[in-house]
């Protein structure tokens, strides 16, 4: 169902990034959800961060970002 732009895994966390250019961070987060990029971590005990990031082609910088955290840990 598509490809995630970047995943970073550490012993305690999983970071799922979706990048947009001249879009919105909300649009990027929506894509993570709609495409099911976090699905393979549904039973993972680490905290999962979904991060939507938008780059502005006009300024060459990040102009918007949003994150959402979830945890499947029982502790």
Q: Model-flagged regions — what are they?
A:
Residues 16, 27-29, 75:
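A short, polar/proline- and glycine-enriched secondary-structure boundary/capping micro-motif
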Residues 21-38:
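Mg2+/Mn2+-dependent nuclease catalytic core
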Residues 9-10, 28, 37, 62:
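Generic hydrophobic, helix-prone segments enriched in Leu/Val/Ile
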Residues 40, 44-75:
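Domain-level recognition of nuclease-like catalytic cores that cleave nucleotide substrates
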Residues 6-21, 35:
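Conserved catalytic cores of phosphodiester-cleaving nucleases, focusing on short active-site segments
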Residues 13-15, 24, 42, 60:
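Generic "edge-of-domain/loop-turn" microfeature
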């Amino acid at each position: 169902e598509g490809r995630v732009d970047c995943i970073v895994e550490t012993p305690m966390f999983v970071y799922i990034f979706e990048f947009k250019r001249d879009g919105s961070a909300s649009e990027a987060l929506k894509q993570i959800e709609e495409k099911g990029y976090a699905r393979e971590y549904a039973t993972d005990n680490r905290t999962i961060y979904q991060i939507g990031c938008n780059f502005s082609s006009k300024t060459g910088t990040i102009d918007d970002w949003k994150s959402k955290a979830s945890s499947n840990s029982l502790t």
